[in-house]
Amino acid sequence: MSAAEVADHYNNVRQAGIQDRKESRIFFMRNMNNWIKSQLINDAMKLVNENGVKSPVVLDIACGKGGDLRKWDITGAKHVVMADVADVSIQQAEERYKTMHKYPHDIFGAQFIVADCTKENLDDKIEIKEPFDLVSCQFAMHYSFVDEDSARTFLKNAVGKLKLGGVFIGTLPDADRIVWAVRNGTEGKFANDVCKITYEKVDELSEGNVPLFGAKFHFSLDEQVNCPEFLAYFSLVKHLLEEHDMELLFVHNFAEAITNWLVPGRRLLESMKGLETFPNRNLSGKTDEEYLEAKAKIDSLGDNVPKFVGTLSKSEWEAICMYLVFGFRKKKTTEKNLESEAPEIKKVTPVPLNEDTDKTAEKNEERIEEKEENPSHC
């Protein structure tokens, strides 16, 4: 799968209007994803502020149509570089940025770059000379894991110009969870009412045969067929980033992230409509099985408590649990405990969703260690 094919796919995706988004089967899931990104950026900004920076210089790599531009404005960013392989997406991002000049306050400076970050040196195209305080890559890094060279080039572009103490955040499909799901499906497939995951080479699903690079799968969401994607095992991502003096601050599966951020972010979650009210007459899911957990919660409430809860349908929840959220920081030159600077975010590993998923992760750790002993790159 070439970068040109990825670009063509995203260039041809129809820009959905507000009404289309409201009528989508995954309306609440998309809003939840957006809320998770907001909480992630908010926590990252705390770390950036602790590094002595109030108005960060930001790289939004694989930025798509610029869906996070408003978030960068809220952070008080000084300058944002938006880079993506799809030229139409960059054009739409730039148009979105231009509308922000109508805001009653000054907004950040920006540069929009069309670049294949898996092949080109992004630094050659960046106009500003300042290093980045914050880098963000949302739902896109895994495309670079088509092969080792592409992944290494992408990660170098992502963090190569990050200042000491700078932060790299992102969201990523959980490769171990996906492998578990398709292994336990039929003929390499997992499907529910909102998503379908297909692993191309079923014979590779036997233990230990899924490659570290080039493991192709297809993820269709809400009847929209996506272009082929590639598994990016988080343990491998961590290993490659450590070569760039990056250290892991945190990694959570989305279910864990929602639990961690629910209390501090509840008001924003409600305003962003990240949860569906149950019960109501127009539920997005059409079967009772989609809301068994919500119904059980309602039944457990006392008689004097309002009988409404916020929820996601079962299918949306299963899809959202296929993702991870992460944060890294570029090591400083001084020897000190960097984690002590960020009490708000604990360094954790994802809670295993089941024993098989955990075993898959452990197996991949072993394979990465073997690769390190016999490196293909000097």
Curated annotation (Swiss-Prot):
Compartments in which it is found: Nucleus
Residues at site: mRNA cap binding?
65, 71, 96, 142, 229, 323
Asked if the keyword Iron belongs to this entry, the reply reads no
Q: What are the alphabetically sorted keywords of the record?
A: Methyltransferase, mRNA capping, mRNA processing, Nucleus, RNA-binding, S-adenosyl-L-methionine, Transferase
Ranges where the record places region Disordered:
335-378
Q: Does the keyword Nucleotidyltransferase apply?
A: no
| PANTHER family attached to this UniProt entry | MRNA CAP GUANINE-N7 METHYLTRANSFERASE (PTHR12189:SF2), MRNA GUANINE-7- METHYLTRANSFERASE (PTHR12189)
- Give the family this protein belongs to, as stated in its UniProt record: Belongs to the class I-like SAM-binding methyltransferase superfamily. mRNA cap 0 methyltransferase family.
What name goes with this protein?
mRNA cap guanine-N(7) methyltransferase
